Amino acid sequence: MLKKLSNGFNPCAKNRKIENGKWKMENGEHTMNDQPNSQLSTVNSPLIPPGYKLTEVGVIPGDWDIIKCKDLCEKIQDGTHFSPKLGGNDYLYITSKNIRYGNIDLKNIERIDTFQHKAIYKRCDVRYGDLLLTKDGANTGNATLNNLQEEFSLLSSVAFLRFDSKKNDAHYFLQQILSKQGQQQIKEAMSGNAITRLTLEKINKLTFPVPNLPEQRAIAAALSDVDELIAKLDQIIAKKRDIKQAAMQELLTGKTRLPMRMENGELKMDNAGNPVRFSGDWEVKRLGDLFAFSGGFTASRDQLSESGYCYLHYGDIHKSGKSYIDIDAEYINIPKLAIELNRINSSALLKDGDVVFVDASEDEEGTSKHIVVINPNNRPYISGLHTIVAKCKTDDLNNEFKRFCFQTRNIKEQFRFFAAGTKVSGISKTNIAKIELYFPSKPEQTAIAAVLSDTDAEIAAFEARREKTKLIKQGMMQELLTGRIRLIENGKLKREN
């Protein structure tokens, strides 16, 4: 199914096919526009395909129904509206921060004592298999199924939906809620509210296209298969990142020395036939001896657009999953600032090999966030608000080595030591200059950077595969959850050849 859908396969296309986002009959007549929110107007409606009907949520199969959440569920309830005292280590206390897209995150879970839990659970008795939906805050609309066998308490920021299992499959409705159409419906339900919130009343009124139970299960199974593939890719990526982190800790501290290579790329061997490894002591210098530091040009996010000169906002450094930015490769996606270049101090214009640090972070881990600029063609690139630009004063460091050398545990601990502030951690140019960096000879820097770059390339390949799989799933959701592709025929599961 995954392979066929990725190639545009449509198992229901006996007398119609999808062409340019529209259904086309064999006689060439287009029948239905593929509208993103599936809200088709009853005014001037196009011809409805045979076996389909027009409803308030769009065109769906004739044997499907449109049903509100309150009529699908045995119970819909949110958690406690009174914050309990944390501690006691008896029962898990789950809030919206623990509900992710399709899973429960227990990394930073809190616990409460038995007395408080019993009082909460009496009203909000969430069970295994219930659907958990965030209803407050920035994560509103995130949902997952409860896969925990133990009792736990919920905060009011999360509601649970208990579907009638004799008629409805919770896995199917999880996919409906997480779909583009489901998220749009939630967004519209929250419109007009000063605070981002989804009330129980609004949840009860959420409306979904509903096939019979066998087809619900077939659709949920097909989409769950893709979810499993995405989860496996996530695991591989996480493992690769752990391997990279361990390799950096070994290679960037000199604990492990790499074998040397000759100019032709072959390993250098000693007389006994063993690889010759790099040796010798590493240098240590303060960053102030290696770099000249300066600030960026202040401009708000609102001033940025798609025209002008490339502009590096400190928020984009925080959000980046990389330690470098390639101007030529990423030019289209880099925000621009429309400004006369002579208004920008030359120290704020980023050159190839410059390192840019953030000077403020909401958490300690973010205080060492940085990127290395790859700009061989010297495109104008402006370093922005809350950035500290580091320009080399010496040729001690390779540009490729810079991408990794600031990611060691030792460097991060020094950043945390010099950072100041409570809610927001900040670091000054003066304090960054005091940080000490250990580094090897330039040939060894090159060898280290090559090994770590290869690992980065592997991670990037898996990330690209994951993103492609996610796009395929989005296409599957659009087709399966609206009935454009049917997995059930004459009441029986279709079998692929």
Model region roles, listed by residue range:
Residues M1-F9, V57, G62-I66, F173, ...:
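Amphipathic alpha-helical segments
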Residues G8, R16-P50, P259-F278, I488-N497:
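Short, basic, low-complexity termini and linkers enriched in Ser/Thr/Gly/Pro
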Residues K17, E26-G28, P49-D78, K205, ...:
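Non-catalytic DNA-recognition/assembly elements of restriction-modification systems
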Residues P50-G51, E151-V158, N168-A170, Q183, ...:
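A short glycine-rich beta-alpha junction/loop motif
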Residues L54, I60, T80-H81, A119-I120, ...:
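Short, solvent-exposed loop/turn positions at domain surfaces
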Residues D63-I104, Y121, T140, V284-D326, ...:
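Low-complexity, Lys/Gly-biased intrinsically disordered segments
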Residues T95-S96, I112-L178, H313-G315, E330-Q407:
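A short beta-sheet element
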